[in-house]
Amino acid sequence: MIERPSGIKIEKFSPTLGAIITGVDLSQKISDAQFNDINQAFLDYQVLFFKDQKEIPPELHIEFGKKFGELHSHPAAPTMEGYPEIFEIHAHKDSKIANGEFWHSDVSCDKEPPLGTMLQLHILPETGGDTMFSNMYAAYDELSNKYKEILDGLIAIHESEHIYKGRYSDRGVSEDKIETPTAKHPLIRTHPKTGKKAIYVNRTFTTGIEGMSKEESSSILNFLFNHCEHVNYQIRYRCLLYTSPSPRDS
């Protein structure tokens, strides 16, 4: 465990990905020193689990998020009344969907996808409800140099209509109120601060590769989907009440 001068303690979660953060109360305003340590841990470990938390008021949830940059509003999902930056998820045993049932990178269909996502759980099931994350830096590193050369410069197409259309209708979201964006992103992206390269495709939103036929792009994408979902790159975490996992799309 590493303890920073700000009082924040960082414990590595696994050799692959993630860290557990203690020594900070996100239900209160945090200092610049605390944020700097959190942000560095975010860069180092990609997924942070904040333990021993109280319920975070929406205003502070938003204030904390804004420390990372401009906040993203979901193009289709229901949001908290008065707080469009907060996406509310409600699911029960009879729900047609929960959320994030399949591997994905959050809203990669947007022209400027979010840096990451901050989650807080208010109600937990007695069993289940685990969340899994996969490390796209590690997945890239394990590719052969020749395959990296093939992928370098390719542009992936990300679409959302097949996902968002009708998805939230049972939660009172009208079809004429949603957006179904499409975007193109480099298949291999480089982090602007760390310089690390990551695979940026996912089974939910990525539908093709620019300049390739469906058959050509499918062969590459299906290989990458399976490769990125390999257990070697994964972690699984069961959240406690009010635990806040903050994943990077990596």
Where are these regions (language model features)?
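Conserved small/polar residues in nucleotide/adenosyl-binding loops
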Residues: 242-249
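Fe(II)/2-oxoglutarate oxygenase catalytic core
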Residues: 2-241
